[in-house]
Amino acid sequence: MSIKISFKKSISSKTFANLVLFVDEKFNAKLIKKYISNSEFSYVSDLLKTSDLNKKILVFNLNSKKKIVLVSIKKNIKNHDIENLGAELYSLINHGKNSQYFINTESVVNSNKSFIGHFLHGMKLKSYDFTKYKTKKEKRSIDIYIIGKKNNISAKDQLKFKALEEGTFYARDLV
């Protein structure tokens, strides 16, 4: 299973198949109102009233082709916790049929400038799969589109994350 990450400044709202939004730790629905339609907002708000708000990630199936994923962010979250959130999201989307997800960075309520970088790094680390000796190799790929203006990951951070991922994957191959 591989992840392909693409950065976009904006995309037509009609193309959103599966949308990932970030909310505060209390799952305040008012923060996501401007990113989804009114009917979707009322549906998600109703479901939030009956959901277990102690979870970090909630997934709402709007219909057979569209999901909204809400990721809860604590106020003083550390970098390794952000990476764990990304890994948890990957675990949820890995077993589904859908292969396209749109992460809206405008909904990030955290002041950490490298939040998206650490979040994606956690997803990439979780996506590792040792397939060297498997006879049937799975060719499925998950496309992650990062949309919004808060998606600026510096070139230095991208190189750092890539080096960490390659080193980690190499060490896992040796073990």
Residue ranges and their predicted role:
Residues M1-V175:
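Short amphipathic alpha-helical segment within the helicase RecA-like ATPase core
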